[in-house]
Amino acid sequence: MESTDVNHSTAWAPGGMAHIISEAVIAGSIGLYFWKKISALEQTVQELQSQLEVQNNQLQWLIQQQTRRLAVSPLAVSPLAVSPLPPQRDYRQQSTTTNAAGNNGAYPSFQFKPPKTAIKGDAAPPQATPKMQCDNGVCKLVRPLQATHGKGARAPSPEKKTVSISKIAKQIEFEHDQIAPARTATTQVSTFSKPSPNPVLRSITPNPSIGEGRDGDESGPSARALDKILNDIDCE
């Protein structure tokens, strides 16, 4: 019995040691992995802390610069530093006072006089009222002509004016009648009254299967068909 127990212990000893070694290797690798991760996290935390410190320093510097600018801003300048403008003198009032006192002032006053538009002895022309004038059943208001001012000016008579207008109207009508046919002739566009033929390609040469007429007569069906085609072309 003792020999059998010794044999069993010697047989299982290498397998048990290998199992223990593998477990130790696995535990060591897991510990190494977590240690690397923790060290990487610590490094990132340190970098973030350094960046925060730099940003805080920049903000403090900007705040200091802003306070300095506000302290030396142009709004803080006292109003006493700006000298007030001297009062402006009223030269018109001074000139009137000097002239009233009889002294010759440095700035004499000038009286403005409007230009004379009307000539002496000329009165305003009376406003003419329009009159009703009827001609061939058509009535219209006609304003009478007013006499012009000045010597030698003469108003035309209404008869001459109406005659000249009627002549111009007749001349315009005559020219319109003479020009209208020429314009219509140039503007008219000539179009085809007949519809265009069907664009079908036809052979002008006679069909060899039909042949000529009997006894060399050329007035057969092929010649008649050719004449018909030529007549259609001439008509178009």
UniProtKB/Swiss-Prot annotation:
Coiled-coil intervals, chain numbering: 36-71
Spans annotated as Disordered: 83-113, 185-236
Membrane topology qualifier: Single-pass membrane protein
Subcellular location: Membrane
UniProt feature, compositional bias: Polar residues: 93-102, 185-195
Superkingdom assignment: Viruses
Biased composition (Basic and acidic residues): 225-236
Keyword check for Heme: no
Stretches that traverse the bilayer: 15-34
CC terms in the record's Gene Ontology section: membrane
Main subcellular location of this protein, as a coarse class: membrane
Keywords, ordered alphabetically: Coiled coil, Membrane, Transmembrane, Transmembrane helix
Official protein name in the record: Uncharacterized protein 124R
